[in-house]
């Protein structure tokens, strides 16, 4: 089966044909680094992490780029309110973001360009747009003139008349059209700024991604991804800038967008008290379980996210890791056809995950001779999705970083004391130790090789 992907630009599923099969190029809009990543961010990055994994499985080389926006109004505001220098805010928050995504088990992108290291490329692109008549300078700003691009609005399916009608009542007097958007803005006192032909200033948000994609992936590349909320204005404006600057029919051949996330039926919001950062969830749950919960719905569909969903995902992973635990042999296997076919069908994760459950069920029904092969198929299938990558014993012994729990040395000491009690036929003491451990969330399992343990 060939890979098919839903293209927001055409509103249809299409067979994916890479521009260069020897190097598939993927770009995803990354974080603006001013605060902790929240679970909505994590949904988007988990979806495109899976896409990158699948592409790397299917093609010899994939260049996966995901940017860091490190100059932005929100960053400046955070710096001014906290008193922390802008460089400190962005460095600290970028490190937090990396730690959180690593804990979820996401791959690092092949390229992670930062906006502030691409200012010269942005200035050069803005200059080309001005020279070609697509942009103009006014009062220290440079603006893209939307009427200069007749088919502006193709991605979001918005006409220019709709854009003008939807513009704010008070339009900046220097704008030629209410729909025009900023490419460059003057820096206010105390704000970061760079020298340019239009004075000291900083780039608009949209030009950043256009310049970075061109620098690392070329004028036209294969896939551009992001959240559904970025279709307009961000991605629409990226397309306008890039196509007009380079004279191309498209910026990316395929545009993909992940759906919205709600919390127990409500929009996630700090005022409703249902706003979860990734870091908060990692204090309660393993990162692998959070990511499985995020992939439980199809990436384009709305996802109603709850802690109960994460707990269910944890139980599923317990079952899958349980298949691998204690086996002397797990046979190497190819990814099963039905799992690969599900993922090649526009990343159909609910179907792919259902096949993982079927493999686990088949394992438990199988005889001893068939089990190593079934375990190998489960490991290969889950591995393509980025799961079952750790040692099974480490999984069962793990505890979220923000929770209290006995350390391994204390648990092993208790197991040894129980072993000695059983040897002395003091079964009451052995049972007491088992019960005491269970009260603290430690489950003992006696087997031919001795006693193993896991966290409940």
UniProtKB/Swiss-Prot annotation:
Coiled coil: none
Reaction catalysed by this enzyme: tRNA(Cys) + L-cysteine + ATP = L-cysteinyl-tRNA(Cys) + AMP + diphosphate
Locations listed in the record: Cytoplasm
Transmembrane segments: none
A Gene Ontology cellular-component term: cytosol
SUPFAM superfamilies cross-referenced by the UniProt entry: Anticodon-binding domain of a subclass of class I aminoacyl-tRNA synthetases, Nucleotidylyl transferase
UniProt-recorded Gene Ontology molecular function terms: ATP binding; cysteine-tRNA ligase activity; zinc ion binding
Cofactor binding description: Binds 1 zinc ion per subunit.
CDD domains linked: CysRS_core
Motif 'HIGH' region location, chain numbering: 31-41
Positions of ATP binding: 270
SMART domains in alphabetical order: DALR_2
Motif ('KMSKS' region): 267-271
EC number: 6.1.1.16
Assigned keywords, A-Z: Aminoacyl-tRNA synthetase, ATP-binding, Cytoplasm, Ligase, Metal-binding, Nucleotide-binding, Protein biosynthesis, Zinc
A biological-process GO annotation: cysteinyl-tRNA aminoacylation
Residues the record lists as binding Zn(2+): 29, 209, 234, 238
Cofactor (UniProt): Zn(2+)
Assembly description: Monomer.
Entry similarity comment: Belongs to the class-I aminoacyl-tRNA synthetase family.
NCBIfam families in the record: cysS
Entry-linked HAMAP family: Cys_tRNA_synth
Protein name: Cysteine--tRNA ligase
């Amino acid at each position: 089966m060939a890979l098919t992907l839903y293209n927001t630009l055409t509103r249809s599923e299409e067979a994916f044909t890479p521009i260069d099969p020897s190097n598939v190029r993927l770009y995803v809009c990354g974080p603006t680094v001013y605060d902790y990543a929240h679970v909505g961010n994590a949904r988007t990055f988990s979806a495109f992490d899976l896409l990158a994994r699948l592409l790397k499985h299917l093609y010899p080389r994939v260049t996966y780029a995901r940017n860091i926006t490190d100059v932005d109004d929100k960053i400046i505001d955070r710096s001014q309110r906290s008193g922390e220098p802008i460089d400190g805010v962005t460095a600290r928050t970028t490190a937090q973001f990396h730690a959180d995504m690593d804990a979820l088990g996401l791959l690092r992108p092949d390229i992670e360009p930062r906006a502030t290291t691409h200012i010269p490329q942005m200035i050069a692109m803005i200059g080309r747009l001005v020279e070609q008549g697509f942009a103009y300078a006014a009062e220290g700003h440079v603006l893209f003139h939307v009427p200069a691009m007749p088919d502006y609005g193709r991605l979001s399916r918005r006409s220019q008349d709709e854009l003008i009608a939807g513009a704010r009542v008070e339009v900046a007097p220097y704008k030629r059209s209410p729909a025009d958007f900023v490419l460059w803005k003057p820096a206010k006192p105390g704000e970061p700024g760079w020298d340019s032909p239009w004075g000291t200033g900083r780039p608009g948000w949209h030009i950043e991604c256009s310049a970075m994609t061109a620098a690392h992936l070329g004028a036209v590349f294969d896939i551009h991804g992001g959240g559904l909320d970025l279709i307009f204005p961000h991605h629409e404006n990226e397309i306008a800038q890039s196509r007009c600057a380079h004279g191309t029919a498209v910026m990316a051949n395929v545009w993909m967008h992940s759906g919205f996330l709600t919390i127990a039926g409500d929009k996630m919001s700090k005022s409703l008290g249902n706003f979860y950062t990734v870091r908060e969830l990692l204090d309660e749950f393993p990162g692998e379980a959070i990511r499985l919960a995020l992939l439980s719905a199809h990436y384009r569909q709305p996802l109603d996210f709850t802690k109960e969903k994460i707990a269910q995902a944890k139980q599923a992973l317990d079952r899958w890791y349980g298949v691998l635990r204690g086996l002397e042999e797990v046979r190497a296997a190819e990814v099963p056809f039905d799992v690969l076919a599900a993922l090649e069908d526009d990343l159909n994760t609910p179907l792919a995950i259902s096949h993982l459950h079927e493999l686990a069920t088949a394992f438990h029904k199988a005889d001893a001779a068939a089990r190593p092969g079934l375990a190998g198929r489960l490991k290969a299938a889950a591995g393509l999705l980025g799961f079952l990558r750790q040692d099974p014993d480490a999984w069962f012994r793990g505890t979220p970083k923000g929770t209290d729990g006995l350390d391994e040395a204390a648990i092993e000491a208790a197991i040894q004391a129980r072993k000695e009690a059983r040897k002395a036929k003091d079964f009451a003491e052995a049972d007491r130790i088992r019960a005491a451990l269970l009260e603290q969330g430690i489950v003992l399992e006696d087997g031919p090789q001795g006693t193993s343990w896991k966290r409940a």
